[in-house]
Amino acid sequence: YRPVWRETIELPLGDISVHFAPPTAAAGTVAAEIWAMMNDDKRYRDADPEERPHLFVEAATRAYADRAHWLNTDGTSSIKPFDLVASSRIAKMMSTYNSDTHTPIASYNPMPVEVVQDPAATTFVVMDRSGSAVSCALTMNGLFGSGIVTSDSGVLLASVPGSGGRGPLSLGPILATDHFTRDFFFAGAASGGVTAATSLISVIIKNLVDIEDLEK
């Protein structure tokens, strides 16, 4: 197994660049679409506080429904990752949005498809005193991996990626940096299966857009 370097899905927020993990870390792409829909044309900033939870749910529902359109069986995307968050595409996805009414699921095209996701994952964020940071998400492809411990080293072996959500489907760490200086602003990662993307976006939207105190 060798590491593979991939370009992130990068979205702007003023002078800040928010980096999302690309497929096969599908939760990163879902999070990127949610972020794009909420921030396109300053939609979230301009929304009344009472509308914002509704906007969040509508954007998340559209992102998960859209996943059925681009997600291949091996976790890759049938569409180039950055094209998934192109302004024209995001505008089309939000064209049916109504600030006062829930959009019926039956009207979605494509329709949402149930995808089994294994919540077995862990995440961590590390920052050093010079201001460098990493945001990581990893999985052993199942609770306790394969359940096999090597006799000589005591290492618990990971399971083989496969059906039942075993793999990087629910992974999606986020990193926000200054677009010009690359100074670090925010790093976050979440586990928990299907809820990872929405949990993380709900935090990052409050701390990068609402500028809410993290202690809250």
Task: Indicate residue ranges for each PLM-predicted region.
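Generic recognition of stable, solvent-exposed alpha-helical segments in well-folded globular domains
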Residues: 26-33, 51-58, 88, 119, ...
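Short loop/turn motifs at secondary-structure junctions and domain boundaries
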Residues: 1, 114-119, 166-167
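Internal maturation/activation junctions in enzymes
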Residues: 40-139, 153
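Active-site rim segments in enzyme catalytic domains, especially the processed small/beta chain
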Residues: 127-203, 210, 215
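Structured, charged N-terminal subsegments at the starts of enzyme catalytic cores
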Residues: 1-56
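Second-shell loop/turn segments in exported
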Residues: 17-23, 45-47, 113, 187-191, ...
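Short, small/polar residue-rich loop motifs at catalytic or cofactor-binding pockets
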Residues: 5, 118-121, 143, 169-171
